[in-house]
């Protein structure tokens, strides 16, 4: 978890705490969210040195995690599907800061950073990607099927996680927990019929679910302009309120997330958040990402809207830290991820008997299973 990371690496951050203690509160303005059937949050917030350093560190960890994944895949140590989150870090960091660990998240196949934000260790994530027994799913889930407490994956079927998210929210309402569920999906899933069915049932039963469309502009290699008749995804719930948010500004995401969580906890039912974001990489590792868009387009977003660079600039402008101090944080993050990947590479593969675990909750009476049972622990 980030809190533990900051404690362990207090040496690298110590000078920053001392230097920044004089700066106090900092007001940050961002693009106001477009609204539909609701008022929406403010277009400004007050932050401080601790939150700024925390966001910078966490998003740096997200990006370095995915950079290491990219390298492991190219070395053919990671096999199969692998979808990276590079460029979209502000969405994950901002939403996580807007809710509690008792709240729930379910997403699609770009799930590595959500595992990290929910409390999994980098080693558990890398080990799962490498199909090792120390992985978070014991090597059986791979890139798309990672799970930890109050995080339900990683789902490989486009849009299928949204009805599940409504179901998780139904459980919260039924059990009167007061918690909410974030159901993440991309613009490529925004036309799936099951999504609209989930909108309907969630609205009918006023379920505490926040449907979050991470609009990174491309569903695989198809631009949203070529696949969707209506581009305002935050209005497509018809009777469900919605917001369109600058998904590259972590504070805009945080404030929208807080507004949405309060909306749901107040018993208003579901709400849709459309995150205007961008992925720098291809759809998956098998996609170079430049056959359907130009390098100039990608570089323009990197240079003008990068979420980590935006935070870096706020920190420098307000004299929270120096370039050297931020570089020290990044170096610590690199070391953390490299060491975690080395441990994951060295970890053993799962035993054959692991194939037969976690299949049924209770023993199932089946004849002729002596051979299979011989592999069980």
From Swiss-Prot:
A biological process term (GO) from this entry: pyruvate decarboxylation to acetyl-CoA
Cofactor dependence: thiamine diphosphate; Mg(2+)
Transit peptide, residue positions per record: 1-26
E.C. numbers: 1.2.4.1
Reaction(s) the record says it catalyses: N(6)-[(R)-lipoyl]-L-lysyl-[protein] + pyruvate + H(+) = N(6)-[(R)-S(8)-acetyldihydrolipoyl]-L-lysyl-[protein] + CO2
Binding residues annotated for thiamine diphosphate, in chain numbering: 109-110, 156, 158, 187-189, 216, 283
InterPro entries, alphabetized: DH_E1 (IPR001017), PDH_E1_Alpha_Subunit (IPR050642), Pyrv_DH_E1_asu_subgrp-y (IPR017597), THDP-binding (IPR029061)
Activity control: E1 activity is regulated by phosphorylation (inactivation) and dephosphorylation (activation) of the alpha subunit.
Pfam families: E1_dh
Gene3D superfamilies, per database record: 3.40.50.970
Gene Ontology terms, MF aspect: metal ion binding; pyruvate dehydrogenase (acetyl-transferring) activity
Organism superkingdom: Eukaryota
SUPFAM superfamilies, per database record: Thiamin diphosphate-binding fold (THDP-binding)
GO cellular component: mitochondrial matrix; phagocytic vesicle; pyruvate dehydrogenase complex
Binding site for pyruvate: 83, 109-110, 156, 158, 187-189, 216, 218
Residues engaged in binding Mg(2+): 187, 216, 218
Keywords, alphabetical: Magnesium, Metal-binding, Mitochondrion, Oxidoreductase, Pyruvate, Thiamine pyrophosphate, Transit peptide
Localisation per UniProt entry: Mitochondrion matrix
Function recorded in the entry: The pyruvate dehydrogenase complex catalyzes the overall conversion of pyruvate to acetyl-CoA and CO(2). It contains multiple copies of three enzymatic components: pyruvate dehydrogenase (E1), dihydrolipoamide acetyltransferase (E2) and lipoamide dehydrogenase (E3).
Subunit field text: Tetramer of 2 alpha and 2 beta subunits.
Record-given protein name: Pyruvate dehydrogenase E1 component subunit alpha, mitochondrial
Species the sequence originates in: Dictyostelium discoideum (Social amoeba)
Lineage: Eukaryota, Amoebozoa, Evosea, Eumycetozoa, Dictyostelia
């Amino acid at each position: 978890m980030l809190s533990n990371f900051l404690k362990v690496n207090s040496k690298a951050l110590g000078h920053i705490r001392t230097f920044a203690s004089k700066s106090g509160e900092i007001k940050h303005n961002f693009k106001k969210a477009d609204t539909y059937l609701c008022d929406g949050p403010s277009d400004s917030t007050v932050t401080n040195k601790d939150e700024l350093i925390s966001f910078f560190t966490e998003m740096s960890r997200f990006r370095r995690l995915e950079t290491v994944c990219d390298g492991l895949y190219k070395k053919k140590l990671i096999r199969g599907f692998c979808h990276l989150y590079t460029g979209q870090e502000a969405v994950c960091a901002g939403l996580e800061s807007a809710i509690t660990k008792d709240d729930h998240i379910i997403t699609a196949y770009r799930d590595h950073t959500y595992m990290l934000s929910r409390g999994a260790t980098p080693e558990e994530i890398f080990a799962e990607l490498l199909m090792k027994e120390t992985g978070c799913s014991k090597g059986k889930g791979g890139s798309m099927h990672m799970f930890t407490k109050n995080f339900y994956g990683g789902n490989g079927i486009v849009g299928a996680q949204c009805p599940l998210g409504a179901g998780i929210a139904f459980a919260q309402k039924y059990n009167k927990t007061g918690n909410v569920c974030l159901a993440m999906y991309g613009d490529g899933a925004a036309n799936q019929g099951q999504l609209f069915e989930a909108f309907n049932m969630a609205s009918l039963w006023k379920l505490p679910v926040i449907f979050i469309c991470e609009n990174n502009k491309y569903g695989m290699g198809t631009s949203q302009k070529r696949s969707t008749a209506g581009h305002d995804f935050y209005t497509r719930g018809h009777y469900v309120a919605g917001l369109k948010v600058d998904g590259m500004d972590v504070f805009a995401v945080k404030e929208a997330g807080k507004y949405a969580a309060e909306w749901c906890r107040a018993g208003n039912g579901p709400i849709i958040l459309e995150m205007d974001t961008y992925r720098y990489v291809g759809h998956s590792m098998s996609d170079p990402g430049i056959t359907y868009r130009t390098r100039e387009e990608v570089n323009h977003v990197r240079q003008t809207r990068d979420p980590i660079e935006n935070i870096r600039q706020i920190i420098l402008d307000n004299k929270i830290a120096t370039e050297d101090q931020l570089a020290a944080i990044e170096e610590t993050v690199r070391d953390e991820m490299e060491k975690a990947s080395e441990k994951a590479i060295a970890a053993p593969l799962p035993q054959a008997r692991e194939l037969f675990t976690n299949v049924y909750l209770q023993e199932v009476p089946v004849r002729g299973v002596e051979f299979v049972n011989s592999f069980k622990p």
